[in-house]
Amino acid sequence: MKRSLFSLLPFLTTCAGEPPQNIGVQDGRLTACPESPNCVSSFESDVEHGIQPLQASLRQVERVLLGLVEANIVESRDGYLHAEFTSRLMRYVDDVEFLEDSTAGVIHVRSASRLGYSDLGANRKRIENIRGLLKQN
């Protein structure tokens, strides 16, 4: 039995994928989504990738994330926050970014899967869940 569990460890750790090199703020915006349907961003305008920004402060977003077991804040600086979300079963890691736009009074978002092509709407659901939690607080 132990041997079976240990043989699964390499597979489970590879589900995390490598941290992307192309995330962060570039020219005042979050990185564009790839063509694959496993990403949403408030900077995108097409139906598949576009999502509304959050009506909140970055501090409120951070408080919500700290209450989510699957979230791990990786970076928080100067109006930008990067968190990794790990799925419970397969341990897939997705990258979620938040960028404060003080002029517009919103938080721009980008949520993208590291692996695979389709996410079956997981990134959109995640952002909408965060939006709902922000409204409760």
Spans of features found by a protein language model:
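Ser/Thr-rich, low-complexity intrinsically disordered terminal regions
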Residues: C15-N137
